[in-house]
Amino acid sequence: DCPWDWSSHEGHCYKVFKFATTWEDAEKFCTEQARGGHLISIKSTEEVDFMIKLAYPILKANLVWIGLRVEDFWRDCHMGWRDHANLLSKPGVVHNTKCFGLDQKTGYRTWVALRCELAYHFICMSRVPR
C-alpha cells in the first residue's frame, strides 16, 4: 500500500506538494520522499486524467513540474523521464529551456518547456511498495 497521505493508481503512489521550488530541488525532494520516487512521468491519458483529479483541487496553480527534462541539450538533445519510462511523444523545445511542466490553462494536458531554475509546485510518484 501507499503511505497514508499518498494516492494510489495503477501500481503507483502519487502525492501533490503545494510548495514551489526549482525542478532540480523538486526531483531531489521526490527521491527523498519514497523509495524509487521521482517527479511524475505521464505514460497514458488515463494517468493524465488521474493526475488532474488529484492535483487540480489541491493546487489550482498555473504550472506544475513533471519529470521530463532535456539532458545534454547542446550535444544530442536526449529527452527522457526521470524514471526512464518510454517517451511517447516529444514536445517542442524552446531555446534555453530544459525542464517541462503542465499548464493549468490547458487543463494540465499540455507539456510546456520551462526554465529549470524557476519555482513551481510539483507531483511526486513512486511504485507501490511490495
From Swiss-Prot:
Tissue specificity: Expressed by the venom gland.
Disulfide bonds listed in the record: 2-13, 30-124, 99-116
Ranges in a coiled coil: none
Taxonomic lineage from the root: Eukaryota, Metazoa, Chordata, Craniata, Vertebrata
InterPro entries tied to this protein: C-type_lectin-like, C-type_lectin-like/link_sf, C-type_lectin/snaclec_domain, CTDL_fold
Other known facts: Shows greater sequence similarity to the beta than alpha subunits compared to other heterodimer snaclecs.
This protein's GO CC annotations: extracellular region
Natural source organism: Macrovipera lebetinus
The protein's name in its UniProt record: Snaclec B8
